[in-house]
């Protein structure tokens, strides 16, 4: 009996590894280069753009040019009032909280880091408004290190495809993805999952008929059964 359980686990592991192999190979062939859709010029501007998110990147990109023109770096933003920042980002979601975070973040950068965004995962999380996901974005995008930021798209798509099992939190999803995706592809895979979730595997009505990885997708297979 115990042998059968062991064999069953081995089969499940093989299926999971095969799914990863097929899905990653598909993305590598069709999207060898994948990047964020946020527009920025340096780590500070990327951090500002990420902290301005929780809405579409397109919406963020509509407000950041004027914001960066007026406050291109931590020093200039640290001298701005919360109200001045608010006026420039008021068309995005939660502008009250975001303007406060941006102001406090810029001041913290000036006080503790000479205006330079730290390239350390733990230090990044000492900045106001910066949690694990944002710190991972900075690691992956700004500093080109292996990291897997888990936003709503990554969380949903990884679960639907079947890349994760029983993950209830972004951290659980992150750990499972990191355990199976080669480090050299980790940051790129983050973009693959985001873009796939944004344009194909959308939240309410996933476009399975347009999906190139449907044949390996757990969600699609359940629909067919």
Residue ranges and their predicted role:
Residues 15-225:
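Catalytic cores of DNA base-excision repair glycosylases
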């Amino acid at each position: 009996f115990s042998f059968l359980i062991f064999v069953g686990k081995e089969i499940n592991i093989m299926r999971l590894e095969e799914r990863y192999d097929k899905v990653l190979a598909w993305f590598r062939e069709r999207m060898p280069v994948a990047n964020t859709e946020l527009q920025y010029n340096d780590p500070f501007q990327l951090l500002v753009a990420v902290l301005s998110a929780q809405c579409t990147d397109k919406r963020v990109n509509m407000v950041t040019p004027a914001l960066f023109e007026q406050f291109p770096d931590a020093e200039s933003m640290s001298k701005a009032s919360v109200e001045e920042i608010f006026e420039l980002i008021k068309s995005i979601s939660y502008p009250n909280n975001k303007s406060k975070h941006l102001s406090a973040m810029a001041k913290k950068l000036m006080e503790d880091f000479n205006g330079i965004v730290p390239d350390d995962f733990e230090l990044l999380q000492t900045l106001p408004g910066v949690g694990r996901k944002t710190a991972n974005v900075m690691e992956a995008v700004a500093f080109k290190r292996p990291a897997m930021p888990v936003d709503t798209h990554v969380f949903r798509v990884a679960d639907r495809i079947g890349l994760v099992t029983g993950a209830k939190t972004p951290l659980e999803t992150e750990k499972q993805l990191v355990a199976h995706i080669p480090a050299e592809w980790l940051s790129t895979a983050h973009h693959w999952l985001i873009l796939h979730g944004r344009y194909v595997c959308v939240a309410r009505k996933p476009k399975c008929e347009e999906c190139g990885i449907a044949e390996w997708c757990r969600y699609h297979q359940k629909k067919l059964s």
